[in-house]
């Protein structure tokens, strides 16, 4: 991922989509930009979104799209999922590369050792250490699942 902000990259992608007449991607990019701008205006005046905050906004967007997919399946409208999947794919281009399952398992094992966690009561401590290390590159559900495995829960 480059050093420039996600907002700048989204703006460049909007220009590219307009030139290439890519309406589907343009629609998603506009929604992402709107979500970032809304998060920025929710902050105090003269403050900006940091890189981590931008990533959180996009991750929240992906999470919402995944929830929409689940709801579509529950109500029998699975045909709507193609658009949701496209939006997820576009959004993920602006997020940091996810950590692999093997890397995540190694990070979890190291966190269990470093915290000295032995049971379910210390699960939160381990998850906190792991989430701080992976910062937006792994989903909380995957971290939780691997921590439970490592602690034998």
Please state what every model-predicted region is.
Residues 1-153:
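Charged, compositionally biased, marginally structured helical/coil segments
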